[in-house]
A protein has these predicted regions:
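Long, compositionally biased
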Residues: 104-109, 116, 163-164, 171-173, ...
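A generic structural signal for well-ordered alpha-helical segments enriched in polar/charged residues
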Residues: 28-35, 70, 74, 174, ...
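Acidic/His-rich, divalent-metal-binding segments that scaffold phosphate/diphosphate chemistry
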Residues: 1-60
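Conserved active-site and cofactor/substrate-binding residues in soluble primary-metabolism enzymes
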Residues: 1, 21-25, 63, 80, ...
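Divalent metal-dependent catalytic cores for phosphoryl transfer on phosphate-bearing substrates
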Residues: 39-145
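C-terminal binding/interaction regions
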Residues: 135, 141-170, 174
Length: 181
């Protein structure tokens, strides 16, 4: 599947600008991590996983990660793409556990990119470029701030990867700096 085909599929099921922007943020974050972790030859695939991870969320929020599997299977998409995107709902909506490092990264950064995005919006600069880990950690501890971003999932993702929370946050900030102002 090409990036263009993935975008067409995504926009068939998603119309809200917020969801489309989130998909692109996760896509680019996944590409950064592919390169960083030594999977450069799979960078585009990691990006597709990020782009399509919430394919079903807008239309089927109660069947998130379940409906997308059906949609992708109907389209004849490869099993590893289906498994990777579904696994980010592990212990939330589905029992498919992230196994590959790519799946663990997706699990960890999906919620975290949302939290970081909310932190950035509160900053005078409105930029990730001058964002520090301590600023994110402060808001991470405030459960009412960006309440829709599960701290438990973010921490579980860091644990799956064998990283500290600080390392996950720092690397995700670096990823976002590469493509955001």
């Amino acid at each position: 599947m090409t990036r263009e085909e993935a975008w067409e599929l995504l926009t068939e099921y998603n119309k809200e600008e917020f969801h489309l922007e989130h998909a692109q943020i996760v896509e680019n974050t996944m590409k950064y991590f592919a390169q960083k972790l030594g999977y450069g030859e799979e960078k585009e695939f990691w990006g597709l996983v990020g782009l399509l991870h919430d394919l079903d969320f807008e239309q089927y929020p109660e069947e998130h990660c379940i409906k997308s599997q059906e949609i992708m299977k109907e389209r004849g998409l490869e099993e590893r793409l289906i498994h990777a995107t579904a696994s980010h709902g592990y212990a939330i909506t589905i029992d498919i556990e992230p196994v590959h490092e790519m799946e663990k990264v997706l699990y960890a950064v999906d919620e975290l990119t949302g939290l970081i995005g909310a932190v950035v919006l509160m900053r005078p600069s409105k930029s990730v470029q001058d964002l520090k880990v301590k600023s994110v950690k402060k808001k991470f501890k405030s459960k009412n701030f960006a309440a829709g971003c599960s701290r438990e999932v973010i921490q579980r993702g860091a644990d799956m990867l064998g990283w500290t929370l600080d390392d996950l946050i720092a690397q995700t900030i670096e990823a976002l700096k590469t493509f955001q102002e």
